């Protein structure tokens, strides 16, 4: 069988020779172009298994995992199963976005909720996901998630010592949909009394993986996949190429390579090309630049849901200032938007969302397109959060003090002054606030039903001591007033490598790319569609598909 080995974007020009053909890199590029491969990469041609000789590899292991966020779980699983595993990490520290999260996992039908007598079923979970994802619903991927997430939860407990408990605020973000639940599906590690769970899951998995013998190569980005193509067009991954400083390292993966490189929310060009949201800020890892996506595309992988993202609202000033340094915390607006006496308005002076809905739904509300008159663009940008002094005296906003909101806010004596300074339609804003105030006095929001759903009423950040919708509604009547510009913010991009229900990468014809797997924000999975199901809705599918990948890899024989 004639085979083509491709080593993409990796080797020093003119230095590498094929073990079979003696073709230099420069010559191979010319030959590849003549045969229609263009600038895809280097073509090393000949019979047999090019690149399989021991002298052509610097390292040989069973599995290479690219990325140490959710990928660390997969590495733990494969190493524990007796498969030697290397993790390549672009950053100088391990953990990725998982280490920055609250460690919550959305796990329907989990043992803890069932032990408390709460009813749940696979059918209910899939009904909920289908209702929330609409035409993006992928039943095979959704079912794979629900079928395997609890195995991942159990393995985190058994292998990494994670002690799970039901998250007290365990409310499905769209619990009003068919199949939604108001308690039990979201789990988080028990970090101890009064301690934060941020990073606990990641730390536990990383420690266990290192103890098992996983080799972590930090500050060592993967730069290319090594593949070969059979006569029938089937692509098989043989390993990868990494860089450590100026050194190139070629790693043979006898069984598989798993892509877990995160999203592309720190790649402005990719965001502009793919996303259908105006979000251009992220609190994810600054190394999430779409590396895994691009490497997979170069070996023919298809992409899925590239227009989608995990969203939230954020104070623009916070993210403008953190852009170079990388935001390491959730925007404080996520904790502010359910408080009494805050509203969001667009440049037209109109409210455009239920401010205390779940953060992903609020983030998506920025995506409306302007179709009125001659204007085109994003209808709800620029946008502003507005509070009055009564709200400021009752709650802290933007990490400020009682009576004095944080630095994102600017003080104005009147709403008219505020509108002029912010470029908001003045008359429209005055009318909108008047209407909002009238309804708020009665505990009503006929426009967006704010505070009427279970999620809002049980929100950790809504005002205690009030009943029903009044927990989140209060009129804005007490000057001075404060305004802060707000923007949609990415928790991460959702789209990535198209995979099947075994986490195997697929090409543009729907064929399996042998020995290439993907998980997390590098895989186009979401929750089996575009939806933020609830707390832990990103980590849940990430480790579920890590579990799926590890289980499938265990069945593979070595490539020859």
Regions found by a protein language model. Give the residues of each.
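N-terminal secretory signal peptides
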Residues: 1-27, 42
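N-terminal Rossmann-like FAD-binding beta1-loop-alpha1 element of flavoenzymes
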Residues: 63-86
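Glycine-rich FAD pyrophosphate-binding loop
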Residues: 81-98
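Rossmann-like flavin
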Residues: 119-179, 411-414, 418-435
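Conserved redox-cofactor binding core of oxidoreductases
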Residues: 147-248, 268, 316-317, 440-467
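Glycine-rich loop(s) and the adjacent beta-strand/alpha-helix scaffold that form part
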Residues: 244-246, 252-321, 539-542, 548
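An anion/pyrophosphate-binding glycine-rich loop and adjacent beta-alpha core
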Residues: 293, 302-424, 428
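A glycine-rich dinucleotide-binding beta-alpha-beta segment and adjacent secondary-structure elements
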Residues: 430-526
